[in-house]
Amino acid sequence: SKFSGRQEEAHQINAACEAYRDEVSSEAAQYDMSDYVDLLLAVMMQESSGQGTDPMQSSEGAYNTRYPQQPNGITDPSYSISCGIQELKYALDKAGCTGPTDLSKIRLALQAYNFGADSYFAYLEENGH
């Protein structure tokens, strides 16, 4: 394998995240994000390891209009997934991502997902990126 064991480990999806695959797949389809199910599960893995009531850590995102916009404000995993998918789709669109193989744009979108897409892209624009 071209990756060291350590990197491979970091990219593995645990059982808790894998258990959400069907739900993530069906929700992703509603937002034309079916090609990104593995990426979405990787985001979930990174954000929460599939634990808790806000597995996508999307409480503070723009799409959360039902729960407090504070860490772990969302108490419904399904709603967290829906918000997280919309947030990532928005970030991918803003990054100009052309598809699941456009890794440089995906990296940009993932950074935007973490920092909040609008403020992140505004920051890049202001700093000439």
Predicted regions: what they are:
Residues 3-129:
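Catalytic glycan-binding domains that act on GlcNAc-containing polysaccharides
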